[in-house]
Protein backbone atom coordinates (compact mmCIF):
# COMPACT_ATOMS: atom_id res chain seq x y z
CA UNK A 1 0.00 0.00 0.00
CA UNK A 2 1.30 3.40 -0.93
CA UNK A 3 1.70 5.78 1.99
CA UNK A 4 1.00 9.51 1.64
CA UNK A 5 4.78 10.05 1.40
CA UNK A 6 4.99 7.44 -1.38
CA UNK A 7 2.20 9.15 -3.29
CA UNK A 8 3.94 12.51 -2.96
CA UNK A 9 7.22 11.00 -4.18
CA UNK A 10 5.50 9.41 -7.18
CA UNK A 11 3.70 12.61 -8.16
CA UNK A 12 6.86 14.69 -7.72
CA UNK A 13 8.84 12.24 -9.84
CA UNK A 14 6.30 12.32 -12.66
CA UNK A 15 6.26 16.11 -12.57
CA UNK A 16 10.06 16.06 -12.84
CA UNK A 17 9.91 13.68 -15.81
CA UNK A 18 7.62 16.10 -17.62
CA UNK A 19 8.16 16.06 -21.36
CA UNK A 20 10.80 13.33 -21.17
CA UNK A 21 8.30 10.56 -20.45
CA UNK A 22 8.11 9.20 -23.98
CA UNK A 23 11.90 9.11 -24.32
CA UNK A 24 12.30 7.42 -20.93
CA UNK A 25 9.56 4.92 -21.79
CA UNK A 26 11.30 4.04 -25.05
CA UNK A 27 14.67 3.77 -23.31
CA UNK A 28 13.19 1.45 -20.68
CA UNK A 29 11.68 -0.73 -23.41
CA UNK A 30 15.03 -0.90 -25.21
CA UNK A 31 16.72 -1.87 -21.93
CA UNK A 32 14.12 -4.57 -21.41
CA UNK A 33 14.52 -5.99 -24.92
CA UNK A 34 18.31 -6.07 -24.55
CA UNK A 35 18.39 -7.41 -20.99
CA UNK A 36 15.48 -9.83 -21.30
CA UNK A 37 15.33 -10.94 -24.96
CA UNK A 38 12.31 -13.19 -24.42
CA UNK A 39 10.20 -10.04 -24.02
CA UNK A 40 10.65 -9.40 -27.73
CA UNK A 41 8.18 -12.20 -28.50
CA UNK A 42 5.29 -9.86 -27.75
CA UNK A 43 6.45 -7.44 -30.44
CA UNK A 44 7.09 -9.59 -33.54
CA UNK A 45 5.75 -6.86 -35.82
CA UNK A 46 7.99 -4.13 -34.34
CA UNK A 47 11.31 -2.85 -35.57
CA UNK A 48 13.15 -3.26 -32.27
CA UNK A 49 16.31 -1.46 -33.34
CA UNK A 50 17.59 1.46 -31.29
CA UNK A 51 15.48 4.56 -31.84
CA UNK A 52 12.85 2.89 -34.03
CA UNK A 53 9.59 4.77 -34.43
CA UNK A 54 7.63 1.77 -33.14
CA UNK A 55 9.63 1.50 -29.92
CA UNK A 56 9.40 5.28 -29.49
CA UNK A 57 5.63 5.11 -30.00
CA UNK A 58 5.15 2.30 -27.53
CA UNK A 59 7.44 4.06 -25.06
CA UNK A 60 5.08 7.03 -25.23
CA UNK A 61 2.10 4.75 -24.53
CA UNK A 62 3.88 3.30 -21.50
CA UNK A 63 4.81 6.76 -20.22
CA UNK A 64 1.31 8.13 -20.79
CA UNK A 65 -0.25 5.19 -18.95
CA UNK A 66 2.11 5.65 -16.01
CA UNK A 67 1.48 9.41 -15.94
CA UNK A 68 -2.25 8.67 -15.85
CA UNK A 69 -1.69 6.16 -13.05
CA UNK A 70 0.39 8.68 -11.09
CA UNK A 71 -2.36 11.27 -11.51
CA UNK A 72 -4.95 8.75 -10.25
CA UNK A 73 -2.80 6.99 -7.68
CA UNK A 74 -5.75 6.77 -5.26
CA UNK A 75 -7.80 4.74 -7.76
CA UNK A 76 -5.44 2.68 -9.90
CA UNK A 77 -8.03 -0.02 -10.75
CA UNK A 78 -10.29 2.52 -12.45
CA UNK A 79 -7.43 4.39 -14.10
CA UNK A 80 -5.94 1.20 -15.54
CA UNK A 81 -9.06 -0.88 -16.19
CA UNK A 82 -8.92 -0.70 -19.99
CA UNK A 83 -5.19 -1.50 -20.04
CA UNK A 84 -5.75 -4.41 -17.69
CA UNK A 85 -8.39 -5.84 -20.04
CA UNK A 86 -6.14 -5.32 -23.06
CA UNK A 87 -3.09 -7.01 -21.56
CA UNK A 88 -5.02 -9.88 -19.97
CA UNK A 89 -7.52 -10.77 -22.67
CA UNK A 90 -6.16 -9.59 -26.00
CA UNK A 91 -2.37 -9.35 -25.70
CA UNK A 92 -2.00 -12.10 -23.07
CA UNK A 93 1.25 -10.71 -21.75
CA UNK A 94 2.97 -12.91 -19.19
CA UNK A 95 2.69 -11.04 -15.87
CA UNK A 96 6.42 -11.41 -15.16
CA UNK A 97 7.08 -8.96 -17.99
CA UNK A 98 5.55 -6.11 -16.00
CA UNK A 99 8.17 -6.69 -13.30
CA UNK A 100 10.92 -6.71 -15.91
CA UNK A 101 9.74 -3.46 -17.46
CA UNK A 102 9.33 -1.91 -14.00
CA UNK A 103 12.95 -2.74 -13.21
CA UNK A 104 14.11 -1.21 -16.50
CA UNK A 105 12.05 1.92 -15.80
CA UNK A 106 13.68 2.30 -12.39
CA UNK A 107 17.14 1.95 -13.93
CA UNK A 108 16.28 4.52 -16.61
CA UNK A 109 14.93 7.03 -14.09
CA UNK A 110 17.94 6.54 -11.81
CA UNK A 111 20.31 7.10 -14.73
CA UNK A 112 18.64 10.35 -15.75
CA UNK A 113 17.89 11.74 -12.27
CA UNK A 114 20.58 10.40 -9.92
CA UNK A 115 20.33 13.27 -7.44
CA UNK A 116 16.56 12.92 -7.08
CA UNK A 117 16.62 9.12 -7.03
CA UNK A 118 17.06 8.83 -3.28
CA UNK A 119 16.42 5.56 -1.44
CA UNK A 120 13.00 6.88 -0.37
CA UNK A 121 12.05 7.85 -3.93
CA UNK A 122 13.36 4.53 -5.22
CA UNK A 123 11.23 2.65 -2.69
CA UNK A 124 8.15 4.75 -3.50
CA UNK A 125 8.52 4.24 -7.25
CA UNK A 126 9.12 0.53 -6.78
CA UNK A 127 5.93 0.24 -4.70
CA UNK A 128 4.01 2.31 -7.26
CA UNK A 129 5.18 0.19 -10.20
CA UNK A 130 4.38 -2.99 -8.24
CA UNK A 131 0.88 -1.62 -7.60
CA UNK A 132 0.46 -0.81 -11.28
CA UNK A 133 1.63 -4.33 -12.18
CA UNK A 134 -0.81 -5.85 -9.71
CA UNK A 135 -3.70 -3.93 -11.24
CA UNK A 136 -2.63 -4.81 -14.79
CA UNK A 137 -2.58 -8.51 -13.90
CA UNK A 138 -5.76 -8.47 -11.81
CA UNK A 139 -7.94 -9.64 -14.69
CA UNK A 140 -5.78 -12.65 -15.57
CA UNK A 141 -8.13 -15.55 -14.90
Swiss-Prot record:
Residues with PTM N6-succinyllysine: 7, 11, 16, 40
Highest rank taxon of the organism: Eukaryota
UniProt record, GO biological process: hydrogen peroxide catabolic process
Annotated tissue distribution: Red blood cells.
Record: residues binding O2: 58
Modified residues (Phosphotyrosine): 24
Modified sites of kind N6-acetyllysine: 16
Molecular function GO terms recorded: haptoglobin binding; heme binding; iron ion binding; organic acid binding; oxygen binding; oxygen carrier activity; peroxidase activity
UniProt cross-references to Pfam families, sorted A to Z: Globin (PF00042)
Residues recorded with modification Phosphoserine: 3, 35, 49, 102, 124, 131, 138
Stretches assigned to the Globin domain: 1-141
List of residues that carry Phosphothreonine: 108, 134, 137
GO cellular component annotations of the record: blood microparticle; haptoglobin-hemoglobin complex; hemoglobin complex
Entry keywords, A to Z: Acetylation, Heme, Iron, Metal-binding, Oxygen transport, Phosphoprotein, Transport
SUPFAM superfamilies: Globin-like (SSF46458)
Binding residues annotated for heme b, in chain numbering: 87
Membership in a protein family: Belongs to the globin family.
Functional summary from the UniProt entry: Involved in oxygen transport from the lung to the various peripheral tissues.
Subunit structure and binding partners: Heterotetramer of two alpha chains and two beta chains.
Protein name: Hemoglobin subunit alpha
Organism: Urocitellus townsendii
Amino acid sequence: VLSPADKNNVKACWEKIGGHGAAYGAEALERMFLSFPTTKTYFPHFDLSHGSAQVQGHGKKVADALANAAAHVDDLPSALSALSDLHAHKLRVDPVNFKLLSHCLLVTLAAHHPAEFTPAVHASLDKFLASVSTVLTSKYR
